[in-house]
């Protein structure tokens, strides 16, 4: 924890701007231009410092999908590669609210439902950091269904790196061979990363360990 004291001038300083429209909401920070669509998904994430789009064209970030999960065996610990054939996008947004509009950060609170389950999420952007924080609470009440969040990043690379207990592991993100096709899921302790040259995107977490990066779509 860190205690930060702010002067009165700092408290009055607006380092962000918000534009609310019927079908989209736009947030401007020193690091990003962020556009949320009517379902609360990230329709655009523009990196100002590096002058580039983070997400693939016409694709959404923070996109949640519920997939049918009926593996051939090991029902509790196994995921079969065909699970993506039957999925439902979590698009039923019941709440979108700007909160914590202060000198240090701006937060958005989202609430979604799908079937019998509830998903609450707080997304935080900072005045002095390029980190985007997602605090996600899921009250999951489904049988033989799993939930994944997707971030389709616009990077020119054929591999992703995953944190493991004794270092890290690099795997291909294509399915050109049967061996690559079988590696549709990767374990990761605390992070995964996709990079090209001097630019990359990392997905960090503190409680989930199943990752995927097929065709450049980072999922958790």
Show which residues each predicted segment covers:
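C-terminal (or distal) subdomains of carbohydrate-active enzymes
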Residues: 1-220
């Amino acid at each position: 924890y860190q205690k930060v004291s702010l002067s009165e001038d700092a408290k009055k300083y607006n380092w962000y701007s918000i534009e609310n429209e019927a079908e989209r909401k736009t947030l401007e920070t020193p690091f990003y231009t962020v556009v949320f669509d009517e379902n609360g998904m990230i329709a655009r994430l523009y990196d100002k410092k590096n002058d580039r789009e983070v997400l693939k064209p016409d694709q959404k970030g923070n996109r949640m999908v519920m997939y049918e999960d009926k593996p051939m065996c090991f029902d509790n610990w196994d995921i079969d590669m065909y699970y993506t054939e039957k999925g439902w996008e979590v698009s039923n947004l019941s709440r979108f609210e700007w909160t914590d509009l202060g000198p240090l950060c701006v937060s958005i609170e989202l609430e979604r439902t799908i079937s019998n389950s509830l998903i609450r999420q707080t997304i935080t952007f900072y005045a002095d950091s390029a980190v985007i924080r997602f605090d996600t609470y899921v009250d999951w009440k489904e049988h033989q269904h799993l939930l994944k969040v997707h971030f389709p990043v616009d990077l020119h690379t054929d591999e992703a790196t995953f944190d493991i207990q004794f270092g890290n592991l690099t795997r291909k993100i294509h399915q050109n061979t049967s061996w690559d096709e079988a590696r549709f899921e990767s374990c990761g302790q605390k992070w995964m990363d996709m990079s090209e040259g001097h630019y990359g995107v990392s997905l960090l977490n503190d409680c989930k360990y199943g990752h995927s990066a097929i065709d450049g779509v980072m999922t958790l």
